[in-house]
């Protein structure tokens, strides 16, 4: 079994997911959350130390438009996460761009967050209630997921498809 840590970076908080796969498919979510960036730095160091996780992080791409301070702050955090992964593993994380996620999961660059979430549900939790979250009594594949955690799962799935399964995007 292999393990992937995927990060959807933000300027203050970031979504992350740790998933386990068997080379054929992602089989389960081990951990998911949205936490303060400085806490995530510590978590990265703790989780990666000697564990052999693959690491993927969503990378910001230039779109030809003016951006605000939040985007630049997010870029700084991407660099800090990158450096921590490099120190712990000897290699940097794999960059996953949003356009790759859209193509991999939806087959279209015009896909929106709702389309990506539905593609994830269709793939990992078909027929499960509440977008695959289930209930407290009967948790589904995506139990505990909210907001940026879905984006982190899209990063993990795209990384898995592209680098583990070898799907051409």
Where are these regions (language model features)?
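Phosphate- and other anionic-substrate recognition elements at nucleic-acid/protein interfaces
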Residues: 1-169
């Amino acid at each position: 079994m292999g393990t992937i840590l995927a990060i959807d970076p933000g300027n203050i908080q970031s979504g992350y997911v740790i998933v386990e796969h068997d080379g054929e498919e992602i089989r389960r979510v081990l951990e998911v959350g949205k936490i303060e960036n400085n806490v995530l730095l510590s978590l990265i160091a703790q989780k990666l130390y000697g564990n052999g996780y693959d690491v993927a992080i969503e990378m910001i791409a230039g779109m030809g438009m003016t951006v605000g301070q939040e985007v630049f702050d997010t870029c700084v955090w991407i660099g800090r996460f990158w450096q921590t992964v490099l120190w712990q593993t000897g290699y940097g994380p794999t960059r996953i761009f949003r356009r790759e996620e859209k193509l991999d999961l939806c087959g279209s660059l015009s896909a929106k967050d709702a389309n990506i979430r539905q593609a994830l549900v269709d793939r990992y939790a078909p027929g499960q209630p509440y977008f695959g979250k289930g209930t407290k009594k009967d948790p589904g594949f995506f139990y505990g997921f909210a907001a940026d955690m879905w984006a982190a799962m899209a990063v993990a799935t795209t990384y898995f498809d592209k680098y583990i399964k070898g799907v051409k995007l």
